[in-house]
């Protein structure tokens, strides 16, 4: 998982898609996995969403990746990842108002650098 997550920016698109498909199949019941796996897989998922939507402009496995992240609890471990996933879904759907609201929430919470980074991706 670590190697896959770190190699996303330089991976061939077909390899990226194939590996993400394997992650989704292997961890389809992520909510039943140990917390360490949940954290790592959810990080890989968010990185995939960023890479797929913002860099590669591909849609393969995006819905499935979002659905997998949403199986996790909205708590201090995964809440931010769920919010970022919502941002990417809003971006995908062209909902600029909701995107701006999420960025405003992040700024209000002191996560200005993250909000600004998302700003550059919209």
PLM features: residue spans?
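Hydrophobic, aromatic-enriched interface-forming segments
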Residues: 1-30
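C-terminal regulatory/effector modules of DNA-binding transcriptional regulators
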Residues: 19-122
